[in-house]
Amino acid sequence: MKNILITGANGQLGNEMRVLSAEHPEYTYFFTDIAELDICDEQAVLDFVKTNDIHVIVNCAAYTAVDKAEENVELCSKLNADAVGYLARAAEANQAEFIQISTDYVFDGTAHVPYKETEPTCPNSVYGRTKLAGEQHALTYCTRAMIIRTAWLYSTFGNNFVKTMIRLGKERDSLGVIFDQIGTPTYARDLARAIYAVIGQGVVPGVYHFSNEGVCSWYDFTKAIHRLAGITACQVKPLHTEEYPTPAKRPHYSVLDKSKIKMMFGIEIPYWEESLKECINALSF
């Protein structure tokens, strides 16, 4: 029986991992957030992993406030980079497998075809740079480390784009949304399913990409959210990125090539609209 540590358990992905754990009773779980384990405390991490004889670490914790990260560089770096190094070292010391969740923000977003794992990284934000540093720490300090980059994550838990667009769609007559940033939404439950598939088969070290299938803009995504949520009174208007400036630069193109993870682990990935429908049906609003 494997002992699995899942950090960031109160976040979107951590909560989805908890929900799906009921489908995998063969494992013993340790779901932690900062109250149970401060992953920025290296000794605490080492002690926890050793004491509980952890076999797999899934790090769902991260500083994800992309714009605030531009000002809170130290805190962002501590959580997204330093803490990943601590977890990786602890995994290596305990001969455990380590799954680190990363992001499309490690790329500059200037591509026109889906990013493969081998594409050069070039982050344009503090968030992206710290997440890339975390990737490097994971692969340097743990021989059984696997990076899964994802993008545009949403779920029924916490605050996210889907829930925000539903709320604003009910509050406003019109809404402006960016149409020239292209990517693929990722339902956190689908990512959690993929992670459990990896755990079941065993980590194969390296970098992988995962999002749902298909491509859309934030504008397209919003239109689909409103259609599936039955919101008809709010007019959604397309905006250029330049019309909505933000402290952190966003990738204009962040579609990820998922061929590697599908081939390596036999994972079938739903299209984003199918998963969005599943999520919205699960929401109470």
Each predicted region: which residue ranges?
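Conserved C-terminal active-site "lid" loop/helix of NAD(P)H-dependent oxidoreductases
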Residues: 217-223, 240-279, 283-284
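Catalytic helix-loop patch of NAD(P)-dependent Rossmann-fold dehydrogenases
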Residues: 78, 83-86, 106-148, 153
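Rossmann-fold cofactor-recognition segment
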Residues: 30-41
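NAD(P)-cofactor binding segment of oxidoreductase domains
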Residues: 71-99
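Mid/C-terminal beta-alpha module of Rossmann-like enzyme folds, strongest
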Residues: 194, 201-247
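N-terminal Rossmann NAD(P)H-binding glycine-rich loop of SDR-like oxidoreductase domains
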Residues: 3-20
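NAD(P)-dependent short-chain dehydrogenase/reductase
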Residues: 136-183, 189-190, 196-197
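NAD(P)H-binding glycine-rich loop region in Rossmannoid oxidoreductase-like domains
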Residues: 42-79
